[in-house]
Amino acid sequence: MEYRILGKTGLKISRMGFGGIPIQRIDAEGTKALMHKLLENGVNYIDTARGYTVSEEYLGIGLEGIREHFVLATKSMSRTAEAMAKDIDISLKNLRTDYIDLYQIHNAPPADLEKVCAPGGALEALTAAKKAGKIGHIGITAHSLETFRMALELPWVETIMFPYNIVEDQAKELIHACAEKSIGFIAMKPLAGGAIEDAVTALRYVCANPDVTVVIPGMADIAELNQNLAAVNDSSPLSVEEEAKMRAIRDALGTQFCRRCNYCQPCSAGISISSVFLFEGYLSRYGLADWARSRYATLTKKASECIGCGACESRCPYHLPIRSMLKEAAEKFGE
């Protein structure tokens, strides 16, 4: 496993980290098995969040007895000092630790970032927690290029997390700026939220960029971990065949697709929006029509039940035309 220094933090971390979203689908014992497998294979960076339901709690159980071998990162959507201070304490309790290596401001659009930095904003609590030894370093995660640009100019920002993958490389210049400013860059959504099926090619693409400090694919089992390890540990140049695969993936996905971040939820009509688009993808792109239709049939609310309120679109960090996409999905499923 290759190791990198995470920017200004000085922390030595593995080139591949562990994305903590998918462990919401397993259990505490399964998480413990994964943590020990990470340790065996030299993966020492773990990412989670207050908003990932039971992820922090499962990781707290899974890391018992081996916490000191890992660089632990979490994040909070809180924007005020009071709320952030509470979240930091909850994270410490959930993770069963007395310190967190990196605490991040989670998905702050430009207006929210201004609130964070204002008097009484979340930055005050983060700074106080750092001074008290509760957290080691402060970072930010974003889905907006404007937020990324703003974060690059903030002296307290030690790391930036942003989507980077085969079909989303708009931030390449900003990622390079991170390297120039000694800001650690954490590549999230290397598989575009599951839209890219070929995990090996996807991870090989991300790791081919020397400005990426760490990539954090989500993993829910040891088979996924082993596959990802094989991809990241392969340091050979990208082949002609791999480049061709990447072009095909770009052509198939374009830019208008769901990354399954679920920031659009809750839907006013009760539709599981990301599930609709997941099954629609399998129907349209991957030739699994029967499976996609059978899974879609299990949804309690179908795409055709969209009431057109637009609340989801106002929350989508990718500005997707969700209402029209739901209409298209409904038509494909014969509604």
Show which residues each predicted segment covers.
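N-terminal binding-site loop/beta-alpha segment at the start of enzyme catalytic domains
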Residues: 1-70
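A general structural detector for well-ordered alpha-helical segments in enzyme core domains, enriched
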Residues: 2, 34-35, 58-62, 87-91, ...
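Conserved, mostly hydrophobic/aromatic
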Residues: 6, 18, 46, 59, ...
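Conserved residues at the C-terminal ends of beta-strands
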Residues: 19, 49, 103-106, 141, ...
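Glycine/proline-rich, positively charged
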Residues: 26-29, 36, 40, 79-186, ...
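Structured C-terminal cap/extension of enzyme domains
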Residues: 39, 43, 173-187, 191-335
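Short catalytic-loop micro-motif centered on adjacent basic/acidic residues
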Residues: 44-49, 73-74, 136-139, 159-163, ...
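Short hydrophobic/aromatic-enriched beta-strand-loop microsegments
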Residues: 69-72, 157-165, 236-242
